Amino acid sequence: MPKVISLQTSFNSGVLDPRLASRTDLKHFYQGAEEATNVITMPQGGVKRRPGFKYVATINAEARLASFAFNVEQTYLMVFTNLSVAIYKDGVHQADVTTPYTTAQLFELQWTQSADTMILVHEDHAPRKLVRGGSHSSWTLSTITLSNVPQFDFGSGAEDVWSGTRGYPKSATFYQSRLWFGGSLQRPQTIWGSKTNDFFNFDDGTSLDDEGIDVTLDTDQVNAITAVYAGRHLNIFTTGGEFSIQDSPITPAKVAVRRETLFGSTSIPPKMIDGSVIFIDRTGKSVREFLFSYNEDAYTSGTVSLLASHLLNSPVDMDVSKGTSSDDANYLYFVNGDGTMAVFNTLRAQEVSGWTKWETTGEIESVSVVVDEVYVIVKRTIDSSVVRYLEQLDVDSYTDAN
């Protein structure tokens, strides 16, 4: 019999799930791969070897990473560890600041930023602000003084809705000149908006347009809020579904919460990329894009991990690197519970999307992107000792920091 040789000129679909091994009826079959480890798929169709992870610093404890960007030139990497945060600029240590967040709370911590101030929230702690001073090494963390805290009757008369007993906000975002808090220990379905341009004042007064907002989701079951996110609209992610508030502007008299989809999400904060908000659904096995449809005047939550769902293994962290030019793809990095990383590239305008797997001789535990620089925390075994390194993806490095 003659031998049939097929020519494959594109790998845009990346790694394909083993269950698709015989799906010759799919176009992805002809631009995918059975395995693609430690490579990067390019929107033009090719693949290239991923850069190495360059050593930056030794971290002496479990850590979680976050980015802080005042502008494209003044950017910082935050390394949260037990009761402390270390601040780096361009890979150089600048300062250490004491925090109240324990190791067990690090991956429950959420934040949002406005100019030189980062708002930090956790349901066990009063909201705090991390403020950059006049130099790269000048930082201050303090408890936010909130005025006119919303009141609620928990059964013994009206009291502050947030307290050490009742819990504090677990998510936050800035939207339409208000600071929004989402969910707390004993008010898991409620969102609160500050007064307009008065971020720490939640006075609802007489419900004038610029006054505070207090809204509880109207659902048939308790869907605890996992994140509030400023996307095209104010998006609300919960354990049981996804919601939006599309009013413009949102006021106490005009705030309609719309239930959009019913997938639910984990506590990993969502990310905006390529016109959609990416979130991990409550199963921890699917990545979905919360995308507004003009035709339906509603949001959809299609899965973007269907073709390579086997690369996801209980994700614990994620971040996004946005393309810097019109022909460069966007990349999403998902840190798995087993220490590997699933990398998704997307360029919607060119119908490009694909997954690859990254691994190293160690376990990747956290990821953060500072502008276009990718940083990770890696747990490695060096000379029989377990260490944790802060490492940076570096195009000039051909090996990892072993």
What is the predicted function of each stretch?
Residues M1-H93, K129, G133-H233, G240, ...:
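N-terminal beta-propeller domains
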Residues A57-E62, Y101-Q105, D160-P169, T261-F263, ...:
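Surface-exposed ligand/attachment interfaces on beta-rich extracellular proteins
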Residues S84-A158, T340-V395:
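Beta-strand-rich solenoidal segments
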Residues L109-W111, R178, T216-N402:
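Beta-sheet-dominated scaffold domains
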